Amino acid sequence: MECLMAKLVPRLELPLLPNNIPSACHWDSSSLSQELDQWLISKLGITDESAKRKIVQSRVMLLACLMHPNGERDRVLLAGKHLWVYFLVDDILESSSREGYGALKSIVWSIATTGIYKASEEHDHHDLVLLLLVEVMVELRKEMPTSLFARYCKILSIYLDSVQEEVKHQINNTIPSSEEYRLLRRRTGFMEVMACIMTEFCVGINLEELVVNLGEIRELVKIMDDHIVTVNDLLSLRKEYYNGTIYHNWVIVLLAHDCATFQKSVDRVCEMIKQEEDSILDLQKKLIIKAKVDKNPELLKFAFNVPMAVAGHLKWAFITARYHGCDNALLDGELFHGTWIMDPNQTVIVKNM
């Protein structure tokens, strides 16, 4: 591990990432963002101004608006609440001890499937987050079609089991192989829920079970998951570098097993993002053709809308204070590139001349 640490340097060359998947943003994103931010700040009882600013500048509602631009307003708001709550739940799960994870896993599963959680009298941060999860899951269970919610729970079960495996790696200071990491992150990313199921819910797409299991759709789900995870790992690199969770990241996995230098590992991750985007666009075309040939309007809606979640996540990853620090003038909505200096407080980019 010490040898690996010696290869890490707090600066790298970041190329302009490909951004060719069609994208859009929900028409009411500004109002929705204010509504979600106020909801979270109120529910968590946050009074500190810097903490409020971090929530607002994390732009999580904007992520939902970019992922589901054609969704019904109330459902997109619920998707935004769901995103925020799972960011918080994921942080709690990943920071738990091996002994504590089992209990947390059971609580999260119980909340999702029954909507019941008995909080402690103190109502600490964990309790407040889990009570938020109760609120969101009760509403989701009420509004989501039964078959879609059943798919949701199936993927949630896989996610909870897989995060437990991730926690073991963190506790033992072990780094999985590239293929192990790819397969693990497909399960811990929870992106079939965030990108596919939530888009189907927000837009009102009704896929038959036979269509859900089409080879092209299953492959699209895997590659979309890969793209979102790879972008996440690259753009959250500064944050993870300073908070001590950097070992569970594509850049470090490749550095440990496949690449000789930090920069070569970054370059390889950027190549992966390009390859994943190309595959998504190819699969999207195939699904559009199939939908038209089969005269299946629901599949056509799926093919047009679901890949937007990937494009939306890419844009958000460049503008969120969650990765790049608060009050950062760099976050102007454009995909930045150049010499990336991983300052402890925020992302700094020196434009290459």
Curated annotation (Swiss-Prot):
Pfam families: Terpene_syn_C_2. GO terms for biological process: isoprenoid biosynthetic process. Mg(2+) 2 binds at D90. Mg(2+) 3 binds at N232, S236. Its cofactor is Mg(2+); Mn(2+). It comes from the Eukaryota. InterPro entries: Isoprenoid_synthase_dom_sf (IPR008949), Terpene_cyclase-like_2 (IPR034686). A motif (DDXXE motif) lies at residues 90-94. Binds 3 Mg(2+) or Mn(2+) ions per subunit. Mg(2+) 1 binds at D90. GO terms for molecular function: metal ion binding; terpene synthase activity. Keywords: Magnesium, Metal-binding. Belongs to the terpene synthase family. Selaginella moellendorffii contains two distinct types of functional terpene synthases (TPS) genes, the typical seed plants TPS genes (SmTPSs) and a microbial type TPS genes (SmMTPSLs). No terpene synthase activity detected in vitro. The Asp-Asp-Xaa-Xaa-Asp/Glu (DDXXD/E) motif is important for the catalytic activity, presumably through binding to Mg(2+). This is Microbial Terpene synthase-like protein 30.
